[in-house]
């Protein structure tokens, strides 16, 4: 569960972003396309794809494919990008089982056609580490229940709902393959339905933040850690979009700190905590070059 200060910050940033999004509809689409390689790279890398960000850009942007890559990984990049683009061009009003199956079919086409677009059934058990997915006999029913619960719950805080959905989806593990990528894709679709930007779960921090949050849910049936992670990533995503839509010049946080006589480690810590409007691009912290805010004294660190 996140505190009220964090909720207020998200609400304020969300309101600002939605106003900008109405004014800059075409820019929003272009920003999403520009962020596509990082979204695809990180989501696939979490599943142990060996493609680098540069490889992913070559495949998606330049249509260049090196011969030393496995064909499966090339399709994984292209198919995930296709699924994201489908959602961009075909906005949905609510999550449905039919949408989930369509996205899965897109994701696994030419990779595992025999299971693409259908839930596990019969004797199709699945294990991830020590976790065993739900009994295949009950997967279909569990998924309809999960979708119905998400769509009908109008009282719970939206990030709590999204985090619970994601954690339970991964706990059920409804597919024979592609569960993590579909789960993260659905999280961003749920945010988009609320007029919010996509989040990027960094591959580099999966062992420190993402996996422990999922493990907590498996052990306690509570998704608080995942809510906190999603809140942090959403704030960063809002900073990214708002800054790109409004800033005259965007520079590395390292340069910003130097220009303002601020200790670099102090500035970096503030960026990580989200107390300055910084965001990552290709793993590097960036910020509006003209940003100044007396509310946060960076020198106190």
Where are the regions a protein language model picked out?
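FIC/Doc superfamily catalytic core
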Residues: 1-177, 181-301
């Amino acid at each position: 569960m996140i505190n009220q200060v964090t909720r207020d910050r998200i609400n304020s940033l969300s309101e600002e972003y939605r106003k900008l999004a109405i004014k800059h509809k075409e820019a929003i689409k272009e920003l999403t396309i520009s962020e596509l390689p990082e979204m695809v790279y990180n989501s696939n890398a979490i599943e142990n794809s060996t493609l680098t960000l540069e490889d992913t850009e070559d495949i998606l942007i330049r249509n260049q494919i090196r011969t030393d890559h496995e064909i499966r990984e090339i399709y994984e990049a292209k198919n995930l990008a296709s699924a994201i683009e489908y959602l961009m061009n075909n906005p949905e009003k609510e999550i449905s089982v039919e949408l989930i199956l369509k996205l899965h079919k897109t994701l696994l086409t030419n990779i595992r056609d025999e299971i693409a677009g259908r839930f596990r059934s019969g004797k199709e058990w699945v294990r991830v580490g020590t976790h065993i997915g739900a009994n295949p006999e009950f997967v279909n029913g569990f998924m309809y229940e999960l979708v119905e619960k998400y769509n009908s719950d109008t009282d719970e805080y939206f990030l709590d709902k999204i985090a619970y959905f994601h954690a339970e989806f991964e706990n059920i593990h409804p597919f024979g393959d592609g569960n993590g990528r579909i789960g993260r894709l659905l999280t961003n679709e749920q945010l988009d339905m609320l007029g919010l930007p996509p989040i990027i779960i960094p591959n580099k921090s999966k062992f420190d933040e993402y996996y422990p949050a999922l493990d907590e849910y498996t052990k306690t049936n509570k998704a608080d850690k995942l809510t906190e992670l999603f809140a942090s990533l959403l704030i960063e995503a809002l900073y990214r979009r708002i800054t790109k839509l409004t800033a005259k010049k965007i520079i590395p946080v390292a340069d910003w700190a130097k220009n303002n006589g601020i200790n670099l480690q102090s500035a970096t810590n503030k960026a990580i905590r989200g107390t300055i409007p910084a965001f990552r691009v290709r793993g590097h912290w960036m910020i509006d070059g003209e940003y100044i805010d007396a509310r946060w004294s960076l020198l106190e660190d």
